[in-house]
């Protein structure tokens, strides 16, 4: 064996090594400069540890071979283990917790799951655009800070259904971000200092511990919040909490869950915000590129809403982002170590335990790969026709192999959307045209001090932008198109042909594609179907029917459920596959050029060599540039179906049409529970919107169309038949160990409002028939006490009984709450059901006048979602949360309910003045009053004076229907007097904090209207009514019921 070369590098000093060769504020830049001096491989000594750096594509290609090298956790990343322990990013190679978490979480980051997150990503992108639009073109924007807010809010919302609302808070960053920035910087610094120096930095160590504790506490609070308030959503947080490792059957411990939440919150936003910041820096430095990018967005999207389907049609945006990440990889290195002694580059010996850092800022500018202009920003080099020709492992900003970034697809989709949204909406300019790029370093990099100004395009105003985005419909989900039905009768499906589908799928994508293909094949007459993982096909490939394989490559290897199948094919002992007819559809991602479609190609070739008959050419879908379902449909129509027609449909003389599924005979009837209530009619939701800003109690507006005319008048009510919140239903199911689809049948019951002798699912029973949140009664407490074997629990329940009003009724403690608290209670489900009242209708005031929009109603309501008075979790209002869950097209059941006769408008609105007083959602009936007055005015009739006194928190918070009321004021329909409790001095609040203060300020006007026979109306809480009445009696004397009419809720 020839002698190995010594690895060059600056000469280290005793104890401190090469510490003095590094600028500790810009250590990365110091190391990059060394690459120019010492070549493609060099080493330095820091903290008594040798660090080897590789800077050429040729060396990186070797280091990415996972049969020779694996990830090493050292330096700053190792210091982060104090924070993230054995999370996905900081776990050592082979660490057990990493394996469990990785296998559980992989499906959560599959392409289809990522596409499902698009709507939430779009929500946060809109918030960014609204902020910039409302700030105006004169505002200086710290682009890195705003992108940090965006990416943190996005990862929290998309993966944990958790809103941080960074754009609605103060100018300071979220506490998690503040702690994160400190920890990242300190970990980087500690990795550069000798341990003796770190030991004497006591204050820094204490601060580090404090920030770590704060971050883990925030993650713990997220877990507690979800457990206290379960949500039936298919998000990452539920996967973390409830997922099970398919290999060991284990779930994740709370410590491991916290570590991975922190990992996602950091890794899921810090590098992406840097990518976006550098991308816009380069765009503003290159006006021609900026113009071409904007033109692409305008041509593909126009001025309409951006959809997930648009992203695959923006290749130049994709190339710009890749080029930006090439020049400025925001995670600037990853580290590997050999599994056994390895010779690198043919001349350097690397031993196990020695770590080699892939120095991406230099590797990705390798002139041997990218040419003499490798340091220049030239996006065309990253267009697909050029990118696909790059040597293997030339572009590795997301790391390598199984330890590469699990959230890469998430980050890329988010960044594409944001770049497209900003280009579509704004013209950007750098605040300082002479700005020279400075890089801020922690363990990641981003521009330092780069600021821009944003001007809305197309002459839009901020208000117009808001209306445009709010009116945009929800994006369609992938693969949702219907297949055209032919004219073959569905009865022909009986005795249909057989077909087998096998899939290899880690993330669930190929499994979903196989299911979709099976579904469409059902309509083509292949009704005898078998669908299973590829491993089940070992020694089990059928020969009397077509076999369709849908699979992908996972980090160069087969998926977990296809490993045995591929090993079988490669073993050399496969029996002849003569008689097997098959076709392969492969999925891949072009950025993994070395392994693109590797496994689908290998399976296709090995089966063919073993004697199987290839039905048609292999289908392929590139997840980077296309919609997988669309590619599958094209391959099905143009390749697979003709092949199946030729080989398996001879009996039909070539006629191979889809079954007409529309000839299925079905009937639809109203839910059983609707028939148990009188006078309910069907309504269809046509609009729903939030009326308040984040940070204040939520109020919503829902509008629905009814199927028949009613005698409703302004001021009347409607009864709504609700369902219980899903999280409350899940609690009940869990307490009685029931699945949602368990069937319950009442063989006999004294309750006439429960379905008799009719099977009903457990979820429907708890959701639609029972008052799960009803406070427990005294008798309930006695019954529960009699069923517990615990003397301690029995005494506690009896204590509750003796102090019923204060401990149960006033705190709204339900039977379900008690069952969750006293786990010793063994209550039969039948007894539980008998304890609960039947779910009742909820009553709301109309907020739309029938004359204003015939056959339509609207409600204005507060969404009750607040900490439970019992101190256990949150209390969810049944009716309001049901209404808040509706979307346009939803069906609800309502019945009209007249208000008391006095709570209506005067018969003669021309001569009788009115004064309306309310706060918050108490505005509802008065909105219908005002709309009816508008209809009266439009008929050419004169109107008597009307005053509306309205109390809320503030003009940008919960000033309900502000613009609409302003229009009515301009028309002379009403005069509005507001009181702002949070900003009383804001015009036009005139210093009045509450409604009664505003009434007092208008004493003269009110007395004059009272003298002209005005009627006073009030709608609100008992507290409001008490304060208002006292104020009015001080100025008007005794109030008669005929002229002072109240509705208290």
Swiss-Prot record:
Its EC number is 1.14.14.1, 1.6.2.4. GO terms for cellular component: cytosol. It is an enzyme of class 1 (oxidoreductase). It catalyses: 2 oxidized [cytochrome P450] + NADPH = 2 reduced [cytochrome P450] + NADP(+) + H(+); an organic molecule + reduced [NADPH--hemoprotein reductase] + O2 = an alcohol + oxidized [NADPH--hemoprotein reductase] + H2O + H(+); dodecanoate + reduced [NADPH--hemoprotein reductase] + O2 = 5-hydroxydodecanoate + oxidized [NADPH--hemoprotein reductase] + H2O + H(+); tetradecanoate + reduced [NADPH--hemoprotein reductase] + O2 = 7-hydroxytetradecanoate + oxidized [NADPH--hemoprotein reductase] + H2O + H(+). Residues 678-906 form the FAD-binding FR-type domain. It holds the Pfam family p450. In the N-terminal section; belongs to the cytochrome P450 family. The keyword NADP applies. This is Self-sufficient cytochrome P450 monooxygenase CYP505E4. FMN binds at residues 505-509, 584-616. The gene is CYP505E4. Heme binds at residue 405. It comes from Penicillium freii. Residues 462-492 are annotated as: Disordered. It comes from the Eukaryota. Residues 471-486 have a biased composition (Low complexity). The keyword Transport applies. Binds 1 FAD. Binds 1 FMN. Signal peptide: none annotated. Self-sufficient cytochrome P450 monooxygenase that catalyzes the regioselective in-chain hydroxylation of alkanes, fatty alcohols, and fatty acids at the omega-7 position. Performs hydroxylation of C10-C16 n-alkanes and C12 and C14 fatty alcohols; and thereby enables the one step biocatalytic synthesis of rare alcohols such as 5-dodecanol and 7-tetradecanol. Converts 1-dodecanol into 1,5-dodecanediol as major product with very little sub-terminally hydroxylated products with the 1,4-dodecanediol and 1,6-dodecanediol more abundant.
């Amino acid at each position: 064996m020839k002698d190995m070369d010594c690895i060059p590098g600056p000469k280290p000093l005793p104890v401190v090594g090469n510490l003095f060769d590094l600028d500790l504020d810009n250590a990365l830049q110091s190391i990059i400069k060394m690459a120019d001096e010492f070549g493609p491989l060099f080493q330095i000594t820091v903290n008594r540890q040798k660090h080897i750096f590789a800077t050429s594509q040729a060396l990186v290609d070797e280091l990415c071979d996972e049969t020779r090298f694996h990830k090493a956790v050292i330096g700053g990343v190792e210091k982060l283990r104090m924070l993230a322990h054995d999370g996905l990013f900081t776990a050592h190679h082979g660490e057990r917790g990493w394996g469990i978490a990785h296998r559980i979480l992989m499906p959560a980051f599959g392409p289809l799951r990522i596409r499902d997150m698009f709507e939430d990503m779009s929500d946060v992108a809109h918030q960014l655009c609204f902020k910039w639009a409302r700030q105006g073109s004169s505002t200086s924007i710290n682009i890195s800070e705003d992108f940090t807010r965006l990416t943190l809010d996005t990862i929290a919302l998309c993966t944990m259904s958790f809103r941080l609302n960074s754009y609605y808070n103060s100018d300071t960053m979220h506490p998690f971000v503040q702690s994160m920035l400190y920890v990242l910087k300190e970990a980087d610094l500690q990795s550069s200092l000798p341990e003796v120096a770190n030991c004497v930095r006591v204050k820094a160590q204490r601060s580090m511990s404090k920030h770590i504790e704060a971050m883990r506490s925030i993650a713990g609070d997220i877990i507690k919040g979800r457990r206290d308030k379960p949500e039936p959503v298919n998000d990452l947080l539920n996967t973390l909490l409830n997922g099970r490792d398919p290999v060991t059957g284990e779930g994740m411990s709370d410590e491991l869950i916290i570590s991975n939440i922190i990992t996602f919150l950091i890794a899921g936003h810090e590098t992406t915000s840097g990518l976006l910041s550098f991308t816009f820096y380069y765009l503003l430095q290159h006006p021609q590129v900026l113009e071409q990018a904007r033109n692409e967005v305008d041509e593909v999207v126009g001025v309409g809403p951006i959809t997930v389907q648009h992203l695959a049609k923006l290749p130049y945006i994709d190339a710009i982002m890749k080029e930006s990440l090439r020049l400025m990889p925001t995670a600037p290195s990853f580290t590997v170590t050999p599994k056994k002694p390895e010779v690198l580059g043919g001349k350097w010996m690397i031993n196990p335990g020695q770590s080699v850092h892939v120095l991406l800022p230099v590797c990705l500018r390798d002139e041997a790969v990218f040419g003499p202009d490798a340091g220049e920003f030239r996006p065309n080099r990253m267009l697909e026709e050029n990118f696909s020709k790059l040597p293997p492992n030339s572009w590795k900003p997301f790391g390598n192999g199984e330890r590469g970034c699990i959230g890469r697809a998430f980050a890329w989709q988010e960044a594409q959307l944001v770049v497209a949204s900003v280009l579509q909406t704004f013209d950007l300019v750098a605040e300082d045209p002479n700005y020279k790029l400075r890089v801020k370093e922690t363990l990641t990099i981003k521009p330092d001090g780069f600021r821009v100004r944003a001007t809305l395009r197309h002459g839009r105003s901020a208000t117009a932008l808001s209306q445009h985005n709010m009116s945009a419909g929800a994006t369609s989900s992938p693969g949702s198109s219907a297949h055209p039905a032919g004219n073959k009768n569905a009865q022909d499906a009986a005795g249909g042909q057989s077909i087998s589908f096998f899939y290899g799928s880690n993330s669930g994508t190929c499994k979903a594609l196989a299911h979709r293909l099976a579904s469409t094949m059902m309509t083509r007459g292949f009704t005898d179907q078998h669908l299973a993982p590829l491993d089940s096909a070992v020694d089990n490939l059928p020969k009397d029917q077509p076999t369709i394989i849908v699979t992908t490559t996972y980090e160069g290897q087969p998926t977990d459920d296809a490993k045995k199948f591929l090993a079988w094919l490669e073993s050399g002992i496969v029996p002849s596959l003569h008689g097997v007819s098959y076709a392969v559809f492969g999925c891949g991602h072009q950025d993994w050029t070395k392994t693109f479609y590797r496994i689908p190609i290998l399976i296709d070739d090995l089966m063919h060599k073993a004697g199987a008959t290839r039905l048609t050419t292999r289908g392929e879908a590139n997840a980077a540039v296309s919609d997988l379902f669309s590619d599958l449909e094209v391959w099905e129509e143009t390749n697979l179906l003709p092949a199946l027609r030729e080989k398996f449909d001879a009996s039909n003389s070539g006629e191979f049409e889809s079954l007409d599924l529309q000839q299925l005979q079905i009937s639809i009837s109203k839910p059983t529970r609707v028939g148990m209530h009188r006078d309910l009619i069907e309504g269809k939701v046509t609009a729903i919107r939030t009326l308040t800003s984040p940070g204040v109690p939520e109020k919503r507006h829902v509008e629905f169309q009814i199927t028949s005319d009613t005698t409703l008048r302004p001021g009347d009510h409607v009864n709504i038949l609700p369902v219980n919140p899903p999280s409350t239903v899940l609690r009940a199911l869990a307490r009685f160990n029931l699945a949602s689809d368990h069937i319950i049948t009442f063989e006999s019951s004294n309750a006439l409002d429960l379905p008799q002798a009719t099977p009903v699912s457990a979820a429907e029973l708890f959701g639609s028939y029972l008052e799960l949140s009803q406070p427990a009664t005294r008798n309930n407490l006695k019954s529960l006490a009699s069923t517990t074997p615990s003397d301690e629990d029995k005494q506690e329940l009896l204590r509750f009984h003796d102090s019923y009003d204060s401990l149960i009724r006033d705190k709204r403690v339900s039977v379900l709450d008690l069952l969750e608290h006293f786990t010793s209670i063994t209550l039969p489900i039948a007894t539980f059901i008998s304890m609960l009242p039947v779910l009742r209708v909820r009553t709301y005031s109309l907020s739309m006048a029938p004359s204003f929009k015939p056959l339509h109603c609207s409600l204005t309501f507060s969404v009750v979602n607040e900490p439970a008075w019992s101190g256990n979790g949150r209390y969810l209002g049944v009716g309001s949360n049901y209404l808040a869950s509706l979307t346009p097209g939803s069906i609800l059941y309502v019945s009209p309910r007249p208000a008391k006769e006095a709570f209506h408008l005067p018969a003669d609105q021309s001569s009788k003045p009115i004064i309306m007083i309310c706060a918050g959602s108490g505005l509802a009936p008065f909105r219908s009053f005002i709309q009816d007055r508008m209809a009266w005015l439009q008929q050419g009739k004169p109107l008597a004076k009307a005053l509306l006194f309205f109390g809320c928190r503030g003009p940008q918070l919960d000033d309900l229907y502000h613009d609409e009321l302003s229009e009515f004021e301009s028309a002379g329909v009403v005069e509005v007097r507001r009181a702002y409790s949070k900003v009383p001095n804001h015009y036009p609040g005139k210093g009045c904090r509450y409604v009664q203060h505003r009434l007092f300020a208008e004493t003269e006007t009110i007395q004059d209207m009272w003298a002209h026979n005005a009627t006073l109306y009030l709608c609100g809480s008992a507290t409001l009514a008490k304060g208002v009445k006292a104020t009015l009696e001080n100025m008007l004397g005794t109030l008669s019921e005929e002229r002072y009419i109240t509705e208290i809720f």
